[in-house]
């Protein structure tokens, strides 16, 4: 009897380990704000709190929330007093903590938008330059002076800091992340966001502004469960203004960063976004590279790629690099069934009324246990059609072509479809075998 109990206990332990491993892999990120969210009457945190159930129903595992601190710009991307959460235009610190607790009650982890490349000062120094920073506490934490600004940021620096390790940000002082006090106090602040506020991970804003080695320092010092960096890489374009077919240099930058930082660090797959939004306009041949793989970061390092259709910068009211609006669901059909970690944008679920279609695709992903490292086999990539099989369990078709011939095995059945996309899986509603037209 004791042996049977021990055996059953071992089997249960193995099952739990397998389940936890799967849950750790099966990630779907949701961006819980847009560029105008700060304007919401009654506060964005309170508004979003009322939609936690709706967001959970889409099947997401993580929600990305806006920058939490005081900021000169209302959206939060020009931060000043980092510990001052009550000065945020999105709501108070108490409202933020309540929102995070509500997401946690649904099993959803919360990712903070971390803006540390640059920082806005409260006061001028003797030179008349804004470079005296306040941390937002009664003590001296994050109370910095010009010594903490990169020496080559000559508009603000006193010349005593280290040179910048990344790209320049002209609108505010670039912080010297090689300064040991800066590293210590920012790490302490991040750990406070975890232990006191409740955040689980980080989205690193403008991560090109400091080196991967600097990012690694903060990741190692704070042990987040999820990290994704914004590295808006520069795609190559041909003379006609169209994206080049080969974007290896673009995606190599993303791969290099993720590998250098290590641990849980991933990067937004800007390469896939650029290729996909060009491809859905009659150029679906773009979605297979010279080695038969996906052309974006997911073709090389899918486990560290976060795919997306639009965000608060590329879409929303900024609209700086938008996905074709009439083809957004083709984009979601791709990212929600393919390797990588897909990110769903708030606007598309709520403002565009695409919640049901997106939720259906997310359910296909969950039901078939598609994960960041899932196996991708591209069956067709031509101008008007793209067909791919994922983990031998799901087939995705996007494009205008009506007849996909015999590419769909007879034991696959339609489980989702919409404007110029269709999804099949090995279980579900049975349809007649033979040729398929969608």
Curated annotation (Swiss-Prot):
Cofactor note: Binds 3 Ca(2+) ions per subunit.
Record's keyword annotation contains Cell cycle: no
Signal peptide boundaries: 1-26
Protein residues bound to substrate: 70-72, 77-78, 203-208, 232, 234, 252, 293, 299-301, 312, 318, 397, 402-404, 414-420, 424
Keywords from the UniProt entry: Calcium, Carbohydrate metabolism, Glycosidase, Hydrolase, Metal-binding, Signal
Site (Transition state stabilizer): 313
Pfam families: Alpha-amyl_C2, Alpha-amylase
Keyword Manganese listed: no
InterPro entries linked to this entry: A-amylase_bs_C, A-amylase_pln, Alpha_amylase, Glyco_hydro_13_cat_dom, Glyco_hydro_b, Glycoside_hydrolase_SF
Record GO biological process: starch catabolic process; sucrose catabolic process
Gene3D superfamilies: Glycosidases (3.20.20.80), Golgi alpha-mannosidase II (2.60.40.1180)
Cofactor requirement: Ca(2+)
Amino acids binding Ca(2+) 2: 134, 137, 139, 143
Binding site for Ca(2+) 3: 153, 168-169, 172, 174
GO molecular function: alpha-amylase activity; calcium ion binding
Highest taxon, organism lineage: Eukaryota
Disulfide bonds, paired cysteine numbers: none
Reactions performed catalytically: Endohydrolysis of (1->4)-alpha-D-glucosidic linkages in polysaccharides containing three or more (1->4)-alpha-linked D-glucose units
Function: Important for breakdown of endosperm starch during germination.
Assembly with partners or alone: Monomer.
Similarity annotation: Belongs to the glycosyl hydrolase 13 family.
Note: Binds starch not only at the active site, but also via accessory binding sites on the protein surface that are important for efficient binding to starch granules and thereby increase enzyme activity.
Name of the protein described by the UniProt record: Alpha-amylase isozyme 3B
Organism (species): Oryza sativa subsp. japonica (Rice)
């Amino acid at each position: 009897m004791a042996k049977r109990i021990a055996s059953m206990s071992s089997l249960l332990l193995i099952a739990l380990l397998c389940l936890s491993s799967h849950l750790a892999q099966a990630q779907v990120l949701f961006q819980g704000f847009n560029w105008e969210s700060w304007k919401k009457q009654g506060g964005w945190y309170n508004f979003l709190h009322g939609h936690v159930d709706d967001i959970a129903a889409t099947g997401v595992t993580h929600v990305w929330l806006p920058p939490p601190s005081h900021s000169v710009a209302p959206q939060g991307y020009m931060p000043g007093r980092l510990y001052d959460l009550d000065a945020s235009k999105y709501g108070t610190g108490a409202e933020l903590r309540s929102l995070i607790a509500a997401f946690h009650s649904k099993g959803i982890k919360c990712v903070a938008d971390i803006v540390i490349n640059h920082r806005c000062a409260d006061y001028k120094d003797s030179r008349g330059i804004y470079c005296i920073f306040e941390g937002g506490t009664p003590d001296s934490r994050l109370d910095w002076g010009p010594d903490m600004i990169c020496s080559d940021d000559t508009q603000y620096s006193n010349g005593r800091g280290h040179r910048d390790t990344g790209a320049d940000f002209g609108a505010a002082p670039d912080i010297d992340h090689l300064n040991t006090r800066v590293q210590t106090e920012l790490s302490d602040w991040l750990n406070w966001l975890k232990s006191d506020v409740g955040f689980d991970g980080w989205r690193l804003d403008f991560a090109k502004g400091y080196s991967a080695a600097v990012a690694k320092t903060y990741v190692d010092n704070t042990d987040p469960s999820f990290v994704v960096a914004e590295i808006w890489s520069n795609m190559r374009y041909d003379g006609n203004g169209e994206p080049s077919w080969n974007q290896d240099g673009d995606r190599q930058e993303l791969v290099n960063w993720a590998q250098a930082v290590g641990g849980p660090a991933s990067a937004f797959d800007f390469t896939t976004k650029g290729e996909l939004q060009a491809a859905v306009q009659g150029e679906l041949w773009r979605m297979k590279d010279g080695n038969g793989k996906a052309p974006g970061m997911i073709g090389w390092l899918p486990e560290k790629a976060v795919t997306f259709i639009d965000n608060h910068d590329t879409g929303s009211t900024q609209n700086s690099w938008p996905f074709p609006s009439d083809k957004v669901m083709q984009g979601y059909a791709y990212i929600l069934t393919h390797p990588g970690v897909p990110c769903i944008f708030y606007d598309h679920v709520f403002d565009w009324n695409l919640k049901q279609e997106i939720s259906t695709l997310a359910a296909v992903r969950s039901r078939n246990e598609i994960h960041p490292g899932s196996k991708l086999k591209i069956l067709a990539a031509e101008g008007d059609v793209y067909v791919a099989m994922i983990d031998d369990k799901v087939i995705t078709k996007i494009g205008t072509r009506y007849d996909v011939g015999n590419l769909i095995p007879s034991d696959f059945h339609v489980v989702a479809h919409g404007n110029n996309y269709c999804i099949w899986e090995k279980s579900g509603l049975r349809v007649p075998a033979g040729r398929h037209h969608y």
